[in-house]
Regions:
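Extended substrate-binding grooves/exosites of carbohydrate-active enzymes
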Residues: 1-213, 218-224, 229-238
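C2-type phospholipid-binding modules
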Residues: 193, 287, 292-294
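Buried hydrophobic-core signal for structured, non-transmembrane domains
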Residues: 210-218, 259, 274-278, 330
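Residue-level detector of beta-strand face positions
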Residues: 213, 229-231, 275-277, 323-325, ...
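Intrinsically disordered, low-complexity Pro/Gly/Ser/Thr-rich segments with frequent PxxP/GP/PP motifs
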Residues: 227-272, 279
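Extracellular and select intracellular beta-sandwich modules with Ser/Thr-enriched
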Residues: 240-242, 291-296
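Beta-strand/loop-rich accessory regions of lumenal/periplasmic or secreted enzymes
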Residues: 260-269, 284, 298-383
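Short acidic/polar inter-strand loop motif in beta-rich domains
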Residues: 278-286
């Protein structure tokens, strides 16, 4: 019925009119969440919601986390509980809490700005585990940049700050958060989406013996609408390959099968993988026959530990007022007594480092860090 527009009697009236006009439509509105009069309602701010608490909310019942999005009893005129950007813990709480009886939909999640969308599989592991969880809508589909040329003549995508005079308020790159670039070029996040959403999953049973499980994630189609292939690979080469016979398997069901690769010589220290894939068997309105719809890679051998006979040498330790010196033959290491940093490392007089090795717990901030979660402020003590 709307987006980020508050909640009140006007929305109740819109819902009633919609149900009267077309009772087959379900009503969704994220703004209609939580009834403050409910005895279990907890008005917790966004900052407090990040803090795990343990609070008794009813006789013999304990809730691990109470946040705005885990509050009960959304208004009766919405058919589903709609939430934005819940944490995994909050989403699991919604999925399991007995006071929630309606299905749950994420009207926005997996904000795809900059280097992002890497947590998608964690959300879908939860969604597939709980029938109450319907899924969600990634914000958003496409970048809203405008084509222009930079000073060197190269085409680039312009956004807030590229047009306004200095000092004028704008939203910066907060419109560059899609799965596609403005010219419909596929961005890396889209490949993660394809993998997480693929209709067929290949799971390990005993890959070393060729045993795998094929899971049909479809709601209506059998596995026989696809063709299947396999490859046995080392790090660089295809060693064996063939087609894979998958019995017709109903939607939501799975089947265990064997991949018919032949015994092969394994080199110590090498890794070997099964690559499995599914393809459209016939032409579809959205894809030609042979379009790859699913893929997986399963390890069939662990990396063997390489044995090295290390030379046995005597280590001499010398203590100084400000450092410790460790020597063994022509190798030298110096550690600062005050900081604990390794300040020097050399072999045959040749330095291996150009300065002290310091612990670094801070990575470069992503767009979502800077523009959304504000980690540079909330977690700056790790800098």
């Amino acid at each position: 019925m709307g987006n980020e527009s508050g909640c009140g009697p006007a929305f109740a009236a819109v819902s009633a009119w919609t149900k009267d006009a077309d009772p087959t439509r379900f009503i969704h509105y994220e703004g209609a969440q939580g009834v403050p009069e409910h005895p279990l309602y907890r008005p917790i701010s966004r900052s407090q919601a990040a803090v795990a608490t343990s609070e008794v909310v009813a006789a013999g019942e304990t809730a691990a986390r109470f946040a705005e999005m885990a509050n009960p009893d959304d208004p009766a005129y919405v058919d589903i509980l709609s939430r934005m950007y819940p944490t995994l813990e909050e989403l699991e709480f919604l999925a399991e809490w007995p006071h929630v009886s309606r299905p749950v939909l994420l009207c926005e999640y997996a904000h795809s700005m900059g280097n992002s969308t890497g947590g998608l599989n964690d959300y879908w592991t939860l969604i597939r585990r709980h029938k109450r969880l319907l899924g969600g809508h990634i914000w958003d589909w496409i970048d809203q940049g405008i084509e222009r040329r930079d000073a060197s003549g190269r085409i680039c995508w312009a956004y807030g700050g590229d047009f306004e005079p200095a000092g004028e308020v704008h939203d910066g790159n907060f419109c560059i958060n899609g799965l596609l670039a403005p010219d419909r070029t596929v961005k890396p996040a889209m490949y993660e989406c394809k993998y997480v959403f693929q209709p067929i999953a290949f799971e390990p049973v005993d890959p070393a013996q060729g045993r795998i499980r094929v899971v049909n994630r479809n709601f209506f189609s059998s596995t026989d609408v696809y063709d299947y292939k396999w490859e046995l690979r080392d790090e660089n080469h295809v060693l064996q390959s063939g087609t894979l016979a998958v019995p017709p398997t109903a939607p939501g069901e799975s089947v265990e099968i064997s991949v018919p690769y032949k015994p092969f010589r394994q080199i110590p220290g090498a890794e070997y993988w099964l690559r499995l894939s599914a393809y459209e068997a016939q032409e579809r309105p959205y894809a030609e026959a042979g379009w790859k719809v699913a893929a997986e890679q399963l390890k069939i051998s662990a990396l063997s530990a390489l044995r090295r006979d290390l030379p046995q040498g005597r280590v001499v330790v010398r203590e100084y007022a400000d450092s410790l010196l460790f020597t063994s033959g022509s190798a030298k290491i110096v550690i600062s007594r005050s900081s604990g940093y390794l300040t020097s490392c050399s072999l045959d007089g040749c330095p291996a480092i150009c300065g002290p090795l310091k612990p670094d717990f801070w990575r470069a901030a992503t767009d979502n860090d800077r523009r959304g979660w504000k980690t540079d402020v909330l977690l700056d003590f790790w800098k």
